[in-house]
Each structure stands twice: as C-alpha cells, then as structure tokens.
A protein has these predicted regions:
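Divalent metal-coordination and catalytic microenvironments
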Residues: 15, 33, 80, 110, ...
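His/Asp/Glu-enriched, well-ordered alpha-helical/loop segment
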Residues: 135-142, 184-272
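Active-site glycine- and acidic-residue-rich loops that bind
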Residues: 20-23, 79-95, 174-177, 245-247
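Active-site microenvironment of metallo-dependent hydrolases
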Residues: 239-348
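Metal-coordinating catalytic core of metallo-dependent amide/deamination hydrolases
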Residues: 28-150
Length: 348
C-alpha cells in the first residue's frame, strides 16, 4: 500500500487521472487508490503454471472482483488479469473468458513484447502469441494487450477486426531493448490504442507528458519521417484513445456534456511553455502539450469533479509523509537486495 500511494501520487501530480494497474497485492492497491482519489483499473498478476505460485491465483482474482469492482463510487474497476502465455495454462485463459462474461469485466495480459519471446512462443506452442490468444478465445473488444511490439500485418488486422485494444509503452520498450511498436500501422487499422508507462520498474517515471513526447519521437527517428505520429494523434492516444482501450470512452477521455469531470490544468506561465498562443483553433497549445510540457507543469487535477491536486499539491494525503515512508521502505529493500548477491544483476 505504501508503494502504491507513492506511484498513484506521482501519476496524479503529473496529470494522469486514470490508470490500468497490473500488479500483486491488489486489495492494498484499491485502498491506496481510495486514499489518493485516482481512478484505477486493477488486474492481478495471475499465473497457475508450476513454479509461479508467487503470483496471484484465479480465486484471488474472482474474490477481488466480488469485493472491489465498482467500489469508491465506481472509480475502482477490477479486471481478469493473466501474466503471460508461459505463466498461465490454457484453462486459465479460458476461465478468464468465462469470468469476463459472467461478471461483466474486462481482461488484461501481456503479448509480443520481445523478439526472442515471440520465437520462444512459436517454438513451444506452434503458434505466435496473437494466434495462441485467439485460439484461447481471448481476443475481443473487452481485452487489452500490453506492448504488442512485434506484430506482423496479419496480426494487426486480426486485432483490429476483433476490437482488441493495445496499451503502447514506448519508454519501457526502449529501456528494455524490446523494440519499437508499429503504432502508425495500428492506428491506421483502427485499433484502440492508449499510451502507458508500464510502471517504475521498467520505466523509472510515471510522467505521461514524457511518454507522449517519446512515443512520437521514436517513430520519427526510426522511420526517418518527420510526419510520423504527429502531436494530434499522440494527444488522442493519451486521452480518448486510452479511455476507449479501457472501455471507458463513454465516461471519460474528453470534455463532453454527460461525461465525468476528470480534468487537468497546466500552468502556462513557465519557461518551457513560453511563448504560448491561445486562439480559437488552439494556437500552439497542441505542440506545447506534446513536445514541451512536463508533469511538473500540472497545477490542478480533478477526478470525478473532486479537486485532488491544488497548486501542485495533493488535497487528500500528506505528501511529505508518503515520501518519507516510501524512502524508508526503499532503503530497506535496497539493503535486503544487497544481501542476496547471488541474485544481483547489472543495473540498466
């Protein structure tokens, strides 16, 4: 819970109002989200293969749906979570599909993140990842796949045809040397595509402004095309695109009559956002938001009409206490890790 309060606070202070969170200890995550005020979709790391018992179980996932789904005035949603094809049995995938229909929830899992992963999946199962998920009945408009870096043309078409959504995590994919996802082709095919950070372990930051900028620049650089993934497409992916990927586009993701008041305000009187031009057609605000803004420019944030960040500070929790507690926990964790020299790996 202490770690999650830190993560949710960082996300909220940098202008994120809604997250998809796949992790363990989901009851504590729900409690932390309730305290911070963030809108959170929870998907437990579920695995049932031998040797993977440190992950959550299917029974825990179902209990969480029954006890937490729709809590905090509807801000907490619980999904069926599945870690990966090598961690979950066929029965786990098919059970998730059954539960999705029975409980009216959604499904989240990882797919096609690394080139070596795809080769291993093909060698083990005789199909690529998307083919296996399709075989298990997982693809569809209620499923969100993380990463999808190594999709071919047929797989992009299949995901588009089934309405399967993708969480695009460009900084994580770059840091872990996973590759560069084919986001322009995904968008052209009509796939619901949102932008994600993947979390502090694989990214070191939860700043969506950083993620937006990098998502555009990595496409321009690798394609040698300055027009690739322009600012307007990026902003849509980070707002209404993400809402659609989460199945929440009727409630959030844009400022419209009847939608929830999830809003972010930036202080434009900052060096990195000056000069700025505000006109009826937007002026240079779009480019400033995507290529110049940072999470530290956020001054106010509302979720469900409640002001959770005022003048850059949380209105719900004692930030100093959250940081102090997280610092103590972090130092303790570092010390324990140093004692396990046989598990030590080079930091990247």
């Amino acid at each position: 819970k202490k770690k999650k309060k830190l993560c949710y606070l960082e996300a909220l202070k940098s202008g994120t109002t809604c997250v998809m969170d796949m992790f363990r200890f989901m009851d504590r995550c729900a409690d932390a989200a309730g305290e911070i005020g963030l809108r959170v979709n929870l998907a437990p790391y579920v695995a049932d293969q031998p040797g993977k018992d440190f992950f959550a179980t299917r029974d825990e996932n179902k209990r969480l749906i029954k006890t937490r789904h729709g809590s905090q005035q509807g801000r907490i949603k619980v999904w069926m979570g599945l870690e990966h094809l090598f961690y979950c049995s066929e029965d786990a995938y098919r059970d998730a599909v059954r539960c999705q229909r029975e409980y009216g929830v959604r499904i989240h899992t990882h797919a096609c993140e690394q080139k070596e992963e795809e080769a291993a999946v093909l060698a083990h199962f005789g199909r690529r990842s998307i083919g296996m998920l399709d075989h298990y009945g997982l693809l569809g408009e209620n499923t969100l796949l993380a990463h999808c870096v190594w999709l071919n043309d047929d797989e992009i078409k299949r995901l588009a045809d089934t309405g399967t959504a993708i969480a695009h995590c460009p900084v994580s994919n770059a840091k872990l040397a996973s590759g560069v996802a084919r986001t322009p082709e995904m968008l052209a095919a009509g796939i619901a595509l949102g932008i994600g950070t993947d979390g502090p372990v694989c990214n070191n930051s939860l700043d969506m402004f950083e993620e937006m900028k990098f998502a555009s620049l990595i496409q321009k650089a690798t394609r040698l095309d300055v027009t690739a993934l322009p600012a307007d497409q990026i902003l849509r992916m980070a707002t209404i695109g993400g809402a659609k990927a989460l199945g929440l586009d009727k409630e959030i993701g844009s400022i419209e009559v009847g939608k929830k008041a999830d809003l972010v305000m930036l202080d434009l009187a900052m060096p990195n956002l000056t000069p700025h031009e505000v006109t009826n057609d937007g002026g240079n605000l779009l480019w400033n938001l995507v290529f110049a803004a940072r999470g530290s420019n956020v001054s106010r944030v509302w979720v469900d009409g409640r002001c959770l960040i005022e003048n850059g500070r949380s209105t719900q929790v004692d930030e100093a206490r959250v940081l102090e507690t997280a610092q103590q926990c972090g130092v303790s964790l570092y010390e324990r890790c140093r004692a396990m020299s046989h598990l030590r790996v080079d930091m990247v």
